[in-house]
Amino acid sequence: ALIMWSVPAIARLLGGNPALAMWLGVANPVMYLHLIGGMHNESLMVGLVCAGLLLALRRRYVVGVALIGVAVALKATAIIAMPFVVWMLMRFIAAKWDGRRYPLAFVLAGLWVAVETMVAITVVTILSGSSWGWVSQLSGNSKVINPLAFPSLLASVATPFAIYINDDITFNQVLGWCRVICQVLMLAGLVVVWWRYRRTDQDAIK
């Protein structure tokens, strides 16, 4: 419901086609077969992130960041949205100072987002009756070897060749190297995209 409400509204604010956004972002096979059919908690995470971004576009940053913070508590990958919200909040703060002091506005926006995110995560942790032990389990997904994941594909291709060089090399070793390489590339790509789309709120959402 959150996704159905927020995705067309975001498209409308960005000057896009809400109907097309509904078909591509909501009524698609991945949504029905993976998120809904698989009963994944990503569906709630995506809904909260979309709602948070919509509220950020409407300048309701306190609630928007809080929703994304709750999404981070559900699935850590939601944190990817936060750096882009920082750009939006920075411009909002700088506008209060007649469009000046962007460096200070950037620092304040970053602190705002970081503190509110931690508060949201803390509240969710306390209300759920959990301890902070869940933080140590964030790397638990690394124990799962998904053949559809790109690092696993690279490891499957590279391992036979690596064995010719050293018989002691195992698939898990190659997979570990591939995962590190892919993580570095993904982080670098995120930084490039984050910096590239910093100029307007519309760019940040895109």
Walk through the language-model features, giving the residues of each.
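Perimembrane helix-loop-helix junctions
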Residues: 81-115
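Aromatic- and kink-enriched transmembrane "portal" helix at the membrane-lumen/periplasm boundary
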Residues: 23-46
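Transmembrane-helix signature of polytopic, membrane-embedded enzymes
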Residues: 7-29, 202-205
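Hydrophobic transmembrane alpha-helices
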Residues: 4-8, 12, 33, 49-58, ...
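Specific aromatic-rich, kink-prone transmembrane helix
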Residues: 44-60, 188-195
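Aromatic/glycine/proline-enriched transmembrane-helix motif characteristic
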Residues: 4, 13, 137-206
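Membrane-interface alpha helices of multi-pass inner-membrane proteins
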Residues: 32-35, 51-55, 61-85
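Transmembrane-lumen/periplasm boundary regions of multi-pass, lipid-linked membrane glycan transferases
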Residues: 115-140, 159
